[in-house]
Protein backbone atom coordinates (compact mmCIF):
# COMPACT_ATOMS: atom_id res chain seq x y z
CA UNK A 1 0.00 0.00 0.00
CA UNK A 2 1.01 3.59 -0.56
CA UNK A 3 2.61 5.65 2.20
CA UNK A 4 5.41 8.23 2.37
CA UNK A 5 8.98 7.02 2.88
CA UNK A 6 9.63 9.78 5.42
CA UNK A 7 7.74 12.80 6.75
CA UNK A 8 8.71 16.00 8.50
CA UNK A 9 6.25 15.33 11.35
CA UNK A 10 4.87 12.00 12.58
CA UNK A 11 1.31 13.17 13.35
CA UNK A 12 -1.02 15.74 11.86
CA UNK A 13 -4.16 17.67 12.81
CA UNK A 14 -7.44 16.44 11.35
CA UNK A 15 -8.30 19.71 9.62
CA UNK A 16 -11.13 20.35 7.18
CA UNK A 17 -11.39 19.93 3.40
CA UNK A 18 -12.54 23.30 2.07
CA UNK A 19 -12.84 24.66 -1.45
CA UNK A 20 -12.12 23.15 -4.85
CA UNK A 21 -8.99 21.42 -6.15
CA UNK A 22 -6.35 23.95 -7.22
CA UNK A 23 -4.48 21.55 -9.48
CA UNK A 24 -4.92 18.06 -10.84
CA UNK A 25 -8.37 18.79 -12.24
CA UNK A 26 -7.51 17.98 -15.88
CA UNK A 27 -6.57 14.72 -17.59
CA UNK A 28 -2.79 14.67 -18.11
CA UNK A 29 -1.95 11.07 -19.00
CA UNK A 30 -4.92 8.92 -20.04
CA UNK A 31 -8.03 9.27 -22.18
CA UNK A 32 -10.54 8.46 -19.43
CA UNK A 33 -10.49 9.60 -15.81
CA UNK A 34 -12.35 9.45 -12.52
CA UNK A 35 -13.00 12.90 -11.03
CA UNK A 36 -14.14 13.59 -7.45
CA UNK A 37 -17.35 15.58 -6.98
CA UNK A 38 -17.44 15.73 -3.15
CA UNK A 39 -14.68 16.38 -0.58
CA UNK A 40 -13.58 13.27 1.31
CA UNK A 41 -10.62 11.50 2.90
CA UNK A 42 -9.53 8.50 0.80
CA UNK A 43 -7.38 5.90 2.55
CA UNK A 44 -4.46 3.97 1.07
CA UNK A 45 -6.50 0.74 1.30
CA UNK A 46 -9.35 2.29 -0.71
CA UNK A 47 -6.92 3.50 -3.39
CA UNK A 48 -5.43 0.00 -3.63
CA UNK A 49 -8.88 -1.65 -3.77
CA UNK A 50 -9.93 0.69 -6.60
CA UNK A 51 -6.70 0.00 -8.49
CA UNK A 52 -7.18 -3.76 -8.18
CA UNK A 53 -10.81 -3.54 -9.34
CA UNK A 54 -9.76 -1.56 -12.43
CA UNK A 55 -6.82 -3.76 -13.43
CA UNK A 56 -8.87 -6.93 -12.88
CA UNK A 57 -11.66 -5.70 -15.17
CA UNK A 58 -9.18 -4.49 -17.80
CA UNK A 59 -7.53 -7.96 -17.76
CA UNK A 60 -4.11 -6.29 -17.38
CA UNK A 61 -4.44 -4.43 -20.69
CA UNK A 62 -3.92 -0.71 -21.05
CA UNK A 63 -2.39 1.54 -18.42
CA UNK A 64 -3.64 2.98 -15.11
CA UNK A 65 -2.34 6.16 -13.49
CA UNK A 66 -3.03 6.93 -9.81
CA UNK A 67 -3.08 10.72 -9.45
CA UNK A 68 -3.51 10.89 -5.65
CA UNK A 69 -1.13 9.88 -2.87
CA UNK A 70 -1.96 9.20 0.80
CA UNK A 71 0.32 11.66 2.64
CA UNK A 72 -1.83 12.41 5.71
CA UNK A 73 -1.30 10.22 8.81
CA UNK A 74 -4.52 9.31 10.64
CA UNK A 75 -4.16 8.37 14.30
CA UNK A 76 -6.36 6.32 16.60
CA UNK A 77 -6.25 5.36 20.26
CA UNK A 78 -6.62 1.71 21.34
CA UNK A 79 -10.06 0.34 22.25
CA UNK A 80 -11.29 0.96 25.84
CA UNK A 81 -8.69 3.62 26.61
CA UNK A 82 -9.76 6.73 28.52
CA UNK A 83 -9.55 10.19 27.00
CA UNK A 84 -6.34 12.18 27.36
CA UNK A 85 -2.81 10.84 27.82
CA UNK A 86 -1.68 12.13 24.43
CA UNK A 87 -2.54 11.65 20.79
CA UNK A 88 -2.87 8.06 19.54
CA UNK A 89 -0.42 6.30 17.25
CA UNK A 90 -0.64 6.42 13.44
CA UNK A 91 -3.26 3.90 12.28
CA UNK A 92 -3.33 4.46 8.50
CA UNK A 93 -2.51 6.95 5.76
CA UNK A 94 -5.07 8.97 3.82
CA UNK A 95 -5.34 11.56 1.07
CA UNK A 96 -7.59 14.61 1.35
CA UNK A 97 -9.45 14.84 -1.96
CA UNK A 98 -11.19 18.07 -2.95
CA UNK A 99 -13.99 18.35 -5.53
CA UNK A 100 -12.66 18.53 -9.09
CA UNK A 101 -9.60 16.36 -8.45
CA UNK A 102 -8.84 13.64 -11.04
CA UNK A 103 -7.97 10.54 -8.99
CA UNK A 104 -7.41 7.85 -11.64
CA UNK A 105 -6.69 7.85 -15.37
CA UNK A 106 -6.92 5.00 -17.90
CA UNK A 107 -5.61 4.61 -21.43
CA UNK A 108 -5.06 1.80 -23.94
CA UNK A 109 -8.52 0.15 -23.73
CA UNK A 110 -11.79 0.83 -25.53
CA UNK A 111 -14.46 3.09 -24.04
CA UNK A 112 -16.82 0.39 -22.74
CA UNK A 113 -14.09 -1.38 -20.78
CA UNK A 114 -12.68 1.93 -19.47
CA UNK A 115 -16.08 3.19 -18.27
CA UNK A 116 -16.90 -0.11 -16.54
CA UNK A 117 -13.45 -0.24 -14.90
CA UNK A 118 -13.84 3.31 -13.58
CA UNK A 119 -17.37 2.52 -12.37
CA UNK A 120 -16.04 -0.48 -10.43
CA UNK A 121 -13.27 1.70 -8.97
CA UNK A 122 -15.81 4.34 -7.93
CA UNK A 123 -17.72 1.70 -5.94
CA UNK A 124 -14.62 1.21 -3.75
CA UNK A 125 -14.23 4.90 -2.93
CA UNK A 126 -16.09 7.05 -0.35
CA UNK A 127 -16.18 9.98 -2.80
CA UNK A 128 -18.97 10.75 -5.26
CA UNK A 129 -17.34 10.72 -8.68
CA UNK A 130 -17.97 11.20 -12.36
CA UNK A 131 -16.18 9.79 -15.38
CA UNK A 132 -14.44 12.32 -17.62
CA UNK A 133 -13.17 11.86 -21.19
CA UNK A 134 -10.33 13.78 -22.82
CA UNK A 135 -12.58 14.86 -25.73
CA UNK A 136 -14.71 16.83 -23.25
CA UNK A 137 -11.96 19.41 -22.68
UniProtKB/Swiss-Prot annotation:
Keyword terms: Ribonucleoprotein, Ribosomal protein, RNA-binding, rRNA-binding, tRNA-binding
Gene Ontology MF term list: rRNA binding; structural constituent of ribosome; tRNA binding
SS bond list: none
Single GO BP term: translation
Highest taxon in the source lineage: Bacteria
Gene Ontology CC: cytosolic large ribosomal subunit
InterPro entries with a match to the protein in the record: Ribosomal_uL16 (IPR047873), Ribosomal_uL16_bact-type (IPR000114), Ribosomal_uL16_CS (IPR020798), Ribosomal_uL16_dom (IPR016180), Ribosomal_uL16_sf (IPR036920)
Keyword Electron transport included in the entry's annotation: no
Signal peptide: none
Classification via PANTHER family: 50S/60S RIBOSOMAL PROTEIN L16 (PTHR12220), LARGE RIBOSOMAL SUBUNIT PROTEIN UL16M (PTHR12220:SF13)
Role of this protein: Binds 23S rRNA and is also seen to make contacts with the A and possibly P site tRNAs.
Subunit structure: Part of the 50S ribosomal subunit.
Family: Belongs to the universal ribosomal protein uL16 family.
Protein name: Large ribosomal subunit protein uL16
Organism per entry: Ruegeria sp. (strain TM1040)
Amino acid sequence: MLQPKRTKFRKMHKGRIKGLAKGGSDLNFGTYGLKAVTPERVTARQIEAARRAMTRHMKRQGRVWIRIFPDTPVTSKPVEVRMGKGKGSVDFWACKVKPGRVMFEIDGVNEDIAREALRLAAMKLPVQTRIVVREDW
